[in-house]
């Protein structure tokens, strides 16, 4: 609870995450230590790094009831993405597990990660810059900057293809980090994939279907909660974490 609260400045999400994942009894003796840990960690984080939310997000368009069917479809899509992420990561890390020599793991992971980052620079790091861009961009010209320094640079018409490839390859980058001896975790990759999945879903719908307009930034935010919920099997954590992150 304290780790999640401190890293993401999200005390409520830290508390709810522990309750959902560990499924402990809802008694005062179990809740009070979690609450103290989460609040203390978040307070220290606020004091040392400031009180600003991790991601800036401005709600330009309010939610409309006519979009509910598309939100349900987004949830299904995010569920499939989270299933792919979980199973593919287990498979790739299983390959690393068969390498007994730690230097072979390091070399294999390093080569894989180097090639992926060279071809797709947004795979480097947590991907928070990409999330910030998709949550705040308002035009194709701004969204296209996600392809800067890549072989897709200058091909704005391939933005959806580029982002879908990132969805497919992010799991290999995360697995190479973890399997090679690093610590990539699954929280940040889940948020990253969710944001891209929500953006791809809404952008594809707006460009290639006759449905109602779907605000890309809103669906990117909902996608973050969707994939996080699917990967962690913790829907309430996804909701509260995204609420506190923005």
Q: How would you label these PLM feature ranges?
A:
Residues 1-246:
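Alpha-helical transmembrane segments and immediately membrane-proximal extracytoplasmic
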């Amino acid at each position: 609870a304290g780790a999640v609260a401190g890293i993401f400045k999200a005390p409520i999400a830290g508390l709810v995450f522990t309750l959902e994942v560990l499924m402990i009894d809802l008694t005062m003796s179990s809740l009070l230590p979690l609450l103290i840990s989460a609040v203390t960690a978040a307070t220290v984080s606020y004091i040392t790094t400031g009180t600003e939310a991790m991601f800036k997000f401005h709600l330009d368009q309010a939610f409309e009831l006519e979009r509910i069917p598309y939100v349900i479809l987004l949830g299904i899509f995010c569920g499939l993405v989270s299933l792919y992420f979980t199973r593919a990561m287990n498979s790739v890390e299983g390959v690393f597990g068969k390498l007994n020599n730690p230097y072979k793991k390091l070399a294999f992971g390093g080569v894989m990660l180097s090639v992926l980052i060279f071809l797709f620079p947004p795979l480097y790091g947590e991907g928070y810059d990409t999330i910030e861009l998709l949550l705040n961009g308002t035009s194709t010209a701004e969204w296209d900057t996600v392809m800067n320094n890549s072989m897709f640079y200058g091909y704005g018409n391939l933005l959806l293809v580029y982002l879908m490839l990132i969805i497919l390859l992010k799991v290999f980058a995360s697995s190479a980090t973890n399997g090679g001896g690093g610590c990539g975790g699954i929280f940040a990759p889940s948020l990253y994939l969710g944001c891209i999945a929500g953006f791809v879903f809404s952008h594809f719908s707006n460009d290639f279907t006759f449905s109602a307009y779907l605000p890309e930034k809103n669906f990117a935010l909902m996608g973050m909660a969707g994939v996080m919920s699917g990967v962690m099997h913790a829907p309430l954590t996804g909701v509260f974490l995204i609420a506190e992150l923005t």
